[in-house]
Amino acid sequence: KLGYCVFSPNFNGLKLLPNFAYTGDIRVSAKAVSGFVDRVLTATGSKKVDLIGWSQGGGPLPNYYITKLGGDKKVSKLIALAPSNHGVGPRAVSRFVNESISEAKHKKIEATFAKAHIASYEQQLGFSNFNKELYGNGPVTRPGVKYTVIEGRYDDVVVPFTNAFLDEPGVKNILVQDPCRDDHASHVNFTYDVNVYQMAVNALDPDHAQPVTCVFQPFIG
């Protein structure tokens, strides 16, 4: 409808439910996405792609690809919807856990999640070694990539909701309630929220951005 070629791959999911995607190690998922982006660039003849992702798909997964796997050379824009950037738990809890448990216990926690092929759930906790590796060593953004983070204050997974935002150069952080104060979208609601959709479309083509028409949505607000 808008003239974009849209690709939506599912990788690294549960072995018995492969369409339940991206539950495995985020590093492995990022490598799969890297290969897929290369295929898209070859098929379309484009030099770069725009990435739109929700939750893990807007936060640690694409950011790992961009910062660790050379994605900054192939990504023009990253539009992140309710991304789990700084963890899905309060920072105070993460700080307490970091100060309270040993590295050996950290490793044991990682191994337990990895064995069940749900490593990404542990990796998105604010106190995880993965989160510290990715976000704890200076800026995660890269020159040449335009970042937009769209988050709402009623997110019930990324808590507090400010964990989603990146306070770094080149990032536009948008709070849904600034233009649409009566939008009560939860974390899952972001995947079909009409107001969020409008903001994402504007981020894709900022030169032709349109005013957001706030829509009241039953069961969301």
Which residues are covered by each model-predicted region?
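Short, surface-exposed "cap/lid" segments of acyl-processing enzymes
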Residues: K1-N12
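A structural micro-motif
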Residues: Y4, K47, K73-S76, V145, ...
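Alpha/beta-hydrolase active-site loop signature
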Residues: G13-K15, N85
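Serine-dependent carboxylesterase/thioesterase catalytic core
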Residues: R27-L134
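C-terminal catalytic-base region of ester-bond hydrolases, centering on the histidine
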Residues: S100, V140-G221
